[in-house]
Amino acid sequence: MTSHSGKPRKVIPITPVASEPTLKGETISSLYEAQKKIYPRSISGVFARWRWVMVVFTQLVFYGLPWLEWGQRQMVLFDLGARRFYIFSLVLYPQDFIYLTALLIISALSLFLFTAVAGRLWCGFACPQTVYTEIFMWIEHKIEGDRSARVRLDSSGWTFEKIWKKTVKQSLWVVFSVWTGFTFVGYFIPIRQLGVELMALQGGWQIFWVVFYGFATYGNAGFLREQVCKYMCPYARFQSAMFDKDTLIVTYDENRGEPRGPRIKKVDYKANGLGDCIDCTLCVQVCPVGIDIREGLQYECIGCGLCVDACNNVMDKMSYPRGLIRFSTQNGVAQGWTQSQILRRVMRPRVLIYSGVLVVLCVTMLASLISRTPLKVDIVRDRAALSRIVAGGKLENIYRLQIMNATETPQRYRIEARGLQGIAVASEPEIEIDAAQSRWVAVRLQIPYGSAAAGSHTVEFDISALAGGARLTEKSVFLVPR
C-alpha cells in the first residue's frame, strides 16, 4: 500500500488478545448498566427480629425526644439562633465546642471498634438509611404484598388495583417523610412552636427545611435504598481497611455447602456428590442490597444477617445442621473453629487498644461535664489606661471582665481580687446577670502607692455566685509603673 505521496505506508500489526477468563462466581458489569430494582423477600428469624427491635428503639428516641420538656423548655434542643444546646440539664455554649469535638472523636472511634469486632454492625441494624428503608419496605409489603406479588404488580399494566395500591403507598410514604422532616427540624426550633407556625403557614425557612429533609427521606428510603449503601456511603469503600481475618462477618461455609444443587429431601445427597446448599437462592432474595453471599465477602454486604435467617430456616426444613451461612470470621471458617475459639480471637490487641482508648475518652468527657462550672469569665485589660494614680494615693489598673451566667436562672456574683498586699476592688463588687446571658463589666483594682515594686505582678480574680455552687478563679497582670 502507498500513500498519496507515493511512499509506502507503514502497517501497524494488530494482534487480537483473548479476554481473561473470569473467576468462579465473578461477573463483569458495565459502568452504565441499568439499575435493576430489588424486591427483597420478607423473612423471620433472630436477626430479622433484632433489626425491628432497633427500628422501634431508634424511632421512639428520635420521634419522642423533641416532645419531652425539661422545666420550661424542650428537653433536647439545638438552638442555633441563640447559640445554645440544651441536653437535659446541660446548657452548652460556643465556648463548649471542645465537647462536640470529643463527641465526634468518640463516635469515630466507636465505629472503628464495632467494625473491627463485627464488621458493618452499624449499617445493618442502626444506620438511618437502613432503618427508614426497612420502614418504607414494611409499608410497601403491607399494601402490595410480598416479593412475588410486588414483582407481578410492577410488571402488570396500569389496572385499577395497581393505581390504588401505588397511590396509597406513595401517600403514606409522603406523610411519613414529612413527619420525619418536621421532627428533625424540631430539634433546632422548639417543636410546638414549629407546629403552630406550619399550621399558620408562617416561617418560610422552617417550611423549606421540613420539605427538604422530608424529600431526602422520601428519596433515599423510597427509591435509592441500597444504592446509597453501595455507591454513596463512603463507609462501604473504606471498611476493608478496618477488617481483618478475625472480624465477625456474614460468611458462607463453602467447604460444607459445595457443590450446591437441588435434591429430594430423603435422598442421600452426599452420595450424589452434593453439599448442604440446595441452591434455593432464598439468601439472595431476602438480601436488601441484592448480593449473593455465597460468592464470598463483598463490600456491598451491610451485615444485617437476613440471609443467615433464611438459610437457617431452610436447613431446619431439610433437617440439616444450622450455620451454613452464619456470623463467623475468615479464620474461623477456614480452620473450623468453635464459637468460643472464634470469640477468643475476636478480643485481639487491636480491639483491646480501641476499647481502652474509648473508655478513657468517655470517662474523661463525663468527668469534665460533671465538674463543669456553670460560669465563664474572660478578662481583657483596658489598654487606654494601663496604670494610673488616683485620689487617696492609690495605684489603679482597669480591667474589662466578660462574665457569662451558664445557668438557667438569674445569678448574682461577687468579684474579689488577691495577689498583692492591700489590693481591693474599687468598683461595684457585686453584679447581677440574667439566665444564660453574659455581661461586660469594668473592674478597677487598687493598691497603696509604693506597696509593690515596679513591673508586672500576677493577680487573681475570684468570681463566685452568691447563691453558692459556682466559683471561678482567673489570672491577670497588675502593672506598676517605674
Region spans (language model):
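Membrane-embedded alpha-helical bundles of multi-pass integral membrane proteins
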Residues: T2-R260, V308, P321-V359
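Cysteine-centered iron-sulfur cluster-binding motifs in ferredoxin-type domains/subunits
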Residues: T115-T130, A221-A236, V267-M315
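Hydrophobic alpha-helical transmembrane segments in integral membrane proteins
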Residues: V363-S387
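Short, solvent-exposed loop/turn segments enriched in Ser/Thr/Gly
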Residues: K394-Y399, W440, A454-V459
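Asparagine-centered strand-capping/turn motif at beta-strand->loop junctions
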Residues: I403-T407
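Short acidic, flexible loop segments centered on an aromatic residue
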Residues: E408-G422
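Intrinsically disordered, low-complexity Pro/Gly/Ser/Thr-rich segments with frequent PxxP/GP/PP motifs
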Residues: V425-G450
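Terminal connector regions
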Residues: I447-R482
